Amino acid sequence: MLKDQLRESRKLSFAIDPFEPGSTFKIFTAASALEHKTATINSTYYAEQGRMRVDNHWIKEAESHEKFEWISVADIIRYSSNVGTTKLAFDLTFPKLKETLKELNFGNKTGIEVPGESRGIFTEADNVTPLSLSNISFGQGIAVTGVQMMAAYAAIANGGEYIKPTLIKRDPNQVTVSELEPENANQLEKRRRVLSQKNTEDLTKALVLAVEKGTGGNAKIPHFQIAGKTATAQRVDKNGGYKGYVSGFIGYPVNVDRKFVIAVYIDNPKTGGYYGGAVAGPVFKNLAEYMLYKNKDISRLAEHEDNDYDLKKVKTNIDMVQVKEAASRSLTPGIVPNMMGLDKITTTNISLKLNLQVVHKGMGVVSSQYPPAGTPIGDDTVVKLEYSPPTYE
């Protein structure tokens, strides 16, 4: 039995292992702002014409031509604005954002019945630097699991009620082979409210706008309203650095009897570019159409001759993201640790644990550190880390 469980765990690496969610995380920053009343869905922010200086770093939009000026919260989601999300987070402040994320169960295991589930990487600090807050607001510098993301999106789809996820198995003929354990049989009765229904309605409308008139256009399904969000995140490789991309899309149909959330993350896509809307969106569309038209008119599923991501190919085209957490290092309070070879998520987590000021430069893994490991930490100590792409033998 244990061997079977471990095999299932390996198959579900995307679901239970941590990864940077990228822009699919922006909706939770917006949710927190609405919950704490620092913004409404129609509040507007000046998006600095595409770039904004934060802690001597530039926060930029994904495309150089995206020079947004005044932009509403709904349009921040629609166009996936990094600058707009940063402004939203700065008004909100980290303690309030953290409160909402904790309510949505980020930083904790969901308790799904699969061994080896990660809690993700989420700071326990009471506050963070402006740059860290900016990065976290749009899904960088934080690591989550696929199950955490789907459960949190389901809370929005459920009108603000969070339901603990559980694993159900059925055979190809839909005969149940694994039922809910008795203690979970009343799972639906254990739902807890984490967001107001009014706010989730506004968030859903923004996500629908993102699909119908924004970055998620390739996930549109005729005759249905789809709420969803794209992501294009840097890919963490086996050595803890960044190489390539992870393309993502999470969404759900609105006002339907068959309710579901689908999360698609494609590791290092080889065709169709690498943007989440272009690569993961069509996969979501095919899977969602199957769910929506199942036992109805499924003839529509054959209408994808121009799409590389045919349903028959979905299984082979999706390699679930597997991120290996960097080997733990011994940390001594008051002493600068050795951060050579670590990625930015890990160094950020370490610096927060030690209350250490860090300046990051570059991308990849740490190739240069000053002052060196073993140096006593003073009140004015600032550790400068330079990152470079990892090398391979």
Please provide the spans of the model-predicted regions:
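Beta-lactam-recognizing serine transpeptidase/beta-lactamase-like catalytic domain environment
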Residues: 1-22, 28-266
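Ligand-recognition elements built from short beta-strands and adjacent flexible loops
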Residues: 122, 223, 264-278, 282-393
